[in-house]
């Protein structure tokens, strides 16, 4: 199993700094408990001196932790340290994390000090923190741009003063892996008392190398990695914890290292943090992006169907995800189409694969991704009916009043009939349309997700709305495009209603075949 790498999460402190608005104490507690459940060793809950809200959050979280160690940030300022300790007074065990700029740039232009004064400030702060706890971390801010001899000198002195963890941050993401590896090795070679502490690293992603720098640091001897879930953080972000955790897991035989993280909790935690912080995870984000386990190439899909290891280095299940189906696009082959039909329970005797595949390609070329319900419509409904829209928008009117009430009226073609419904709600424009359409169709549909995308055209701005609706435990997706957000939303939902109508028609047809 090898030595353990301590995982230090700073999502609630360094990660939150990237958000436009601070999180409430309730939201921070929810994230903190999810991180603890995941097995994070140390959780930096905030910077208590920075605001009353941060103080309250740290104080609240400190009462709840059962296994994770809570940590608070403090400058080399007496009051900072006092407040940090006070905020964590209810914790069974806590860490004070002191930081100070050590690079010539920070020392001269930011702190307006000389290096000797910096040493004195650091020693004073550590001795002050020792009055409250034996668990003291000292960070050499901007260590990546600090001359190695100066870095070694301050590290040696803060260890003598009582620091138990020394953190080496690449604050602006300036170093590359070889350079960062050499910094860590130099500290082990030149600092005589380095064996008395845990050496930690805190990498930023300025050059896109935060994860690589963190891994090369533990190869050089560092035993704590600091980072954030989803790589949240100021500027280009921090080391993404999920990336280093999985890298250590996959390369455990080469690294001879391990963590105590419960890997199957990763996706649940990622999703919670993304939702609470209202941050969008790039679809191609390693480990946790929506495309991380997606395969659209026909060659890749064929390989995946034969053995998922052909194109996947980890399984979705290993991070807490259900098995993910193959995306159906114009690049998909017959094998993928047949696989999807089989997964839906359709015997090949019920349809003609060659005919279905040709129809599928035409649809995929026109719209991109094809969903299962569209595939079964192609298989079992004739072309004329497939292109006929049962539901069509005749007229709509939506008004949002200053009182917060939205009034909507929709006239909808339902086959040859026209149906009308009206709604008054305080739930906003989108929900007013959803509620009104629900009244007209009387279908048990549930709005699960909505995404707005603006497209700038030479003259106009086109608003695209993507909607996800659940119907009878099945997910349906629709898209609408218009200059008007209300019309885009209505189009997207009506697109879905037509697909639901076709899905129901397929069910009726198949029941008739069986009987």
Curated annotation (Swiss-Prot):
Q: Which UniProt keywords apply?
A: Amino-acid biosynthesis, Branched-chain amino acid biosynthesis, Cytoplasm, Leucine biosynthesis, Manganese, Metal-binding, Transferase
Q: Name one GO cellular component term.
A: cytosol
What compartments host this protein? Cytoplasm
Pathway recorded for this protein: Amino-acid biosynthesis; L-leucine biosynthesis; L-leucine from 3-methyl-2-oxobutanoate: step 1/4
Coiled coil location:
none
In its UniProt record, a GO molecular function of this protein is: metal ion binding
- State its cofactor: Mn(2+)
Q: What SMART domains does the record tag this protein with? A: LeuA_dimer (SM00917)
Cited InterPro entries? 2-IPM_HCS-like (IPR050073), 2-isopropylmalate_synth_dimer (IPR013709), AIPM/Hcit_synth_CS (IPR002034), Aldolase_TIM (IPR013785), LeuA/HCS_post-cat (IPR054691), LeuA_bact_synth (IPR005671), PYR_CT (IPR000891)
Q: What is its EC number?
A: 2.3.3.13
Which domain of life, per UniProt?
A: Bacteria
One GO term of the biological process aspect:
L-leucine biosynthetic process
Instruction: Name the residues that bind Mn(2+).
Output: 14, 202, 204, 238
**Keyword Transmembrane annotated:** no
Residue ranges of the Pyruvate carboxyltransferase domain?
Answer: 5-267
Q: Where is this region: Regulatory domain?
A: 392-515
Q: Which reaction does it catalyse?
A: 3-methyl-2-oxobutanoate + acetyl-CoA + H2O = (2S)-2-isopropylmalate + CoA + H(+)
Q: List, alphabetically, the Pfam families matched.
A: HCS_D2, HMGL-like, LeuA_dimer
Write down the PANTHER family for this protein, in alphabetical order: 2-ISOPROPYLMALATE SYNTHASE 1, CHLOROPLASTIC-RELATED (PTHR10277:SF9), HOMOCITRATE SYNTHASE-RELATED (PTHR10277)
* Role of this protein: Catalyzes the condensation of the acetyl group of acetyl-CoA with 3-methyl-2-oxobutanoate (2-ketoisovalerate) to form 3-carboxy-3-hydroxy-4-methylpentanoate (2-isopropylmalate).
NCBIfam families the record matches: leuA_bact, PRK00915.1-1, PRK00915.1-3
* Family the UniProt entry places it in: Belongs to the alpha-IPM synthase/homocitrate synthase family. LeuA type 1 subfamily.
Q: How does it assemble?
A: Homodimer.
How is this protein named in the record?
Answer: 2-isopropylmalate synthase
What is the native source organism of this protein? Buchnera aphidicola subsp. Pemphigus spyrothecae
